[in-house]
Amino acid sequence: MERNSLLVCQLLCLVARAAATSTAQTTLPSTVNSTATGVTSDSQQNTTQLPASSAAALSLPSASAVQAHSPSSFSDTYPTATALCGTLVVVGIVLCLSLASTVRSKELPSDHEPLEAWEQGSDVEAPPLPEKSPCPEHVPEIRVEIPRYV
């Protein structure tokens, strides 16, 4: 079980690292040039003052700028959402595998449990079947015996 939890931690760290890397790669400063007024505005410089005519030019991006910066896939558009979805998928797979190993370990005897105790079965015994069926006389009786494999 310790091995499974170590694998879970390693997978989660790997996914978190990939998410941080993809987010860092897509966070770039955007620079807008207005050739009509000769004013350059950088997103990192907040002290740039723009005249009213260039503010209107900056608010409407040209078609070439939109095409040049448009992402081509969902992972380019939403890197954080992609990383979170990947994390959820990995966590779901790990949970399913750990649940399956837990169920499997309960079905088989453990190494520490003596095999004789497993073969003897539990202390709860099935009640004996009644000799006479509680069904009325005109209803046919179907009796099924289920063998118990030990």
UniProtKB/Swiss-Prot annotation:
Residues 27-54, 108-138 are annotated as: Disordered. InterPro entries: Cytomega_UL124. The chain crosses the membrane at residues 83-103. The keyword Nucleotide-binding does not apply. Pfam families: HCMV_UL124. It is found in: Host membrane. Residues 32-49 have a biased composition (Polar residues). Keywords: Host membrane, Membrane, Signal, Transmembrane, Transmembrane helix. It is a single-pass membrane protein. Belongs to the HHV-5 UL124 protein family. This is Uncharacterized protein UL124. It comes from Human cytomegalovirus (strain Merlin).
